[in-house]
């Protein structure tokens, strides 16, 4: 099963997460199919969250499940974008 989840990067005490589509049996930071965004929880001035919405929609369309944390981040990103 394909799952969209966070893969941790960064250094000690300075986490950085890639939002990736991966097989659920792979390790957290292991092999992934596609990187669809990033989340930087310690960003001060720069962009802290970016999600390629078109790719996220594609993966959900082919049956990928979102992890609970990624689901929360997607909702947060939707609120942050101005209504068009």
Swiss-Prot record:
One of its GO terms (cellular component) is small ribosomal subunit. One of its GO terms (molecular function) is structural constituent of ribosome. Keywords: Ribonucleoprotein, Ribosomal protein. InterPro entries: Ribosomal_bS16 (IPR000307), Ribosomal_bS16_dom_sf (IPR023803). Coiled coil: none annotated. Disulfide bonds: none annotated. GO terms for biological process: translation. It comes from the Bacteria. The keyword Signal does not apply. Belongs to the bacterial ribosomal protein bS16 family. This is Small ribosomal subunit protein bS16. It comes from Paraburkholderia xenovorans (strain LB400). The gene is rpsP.
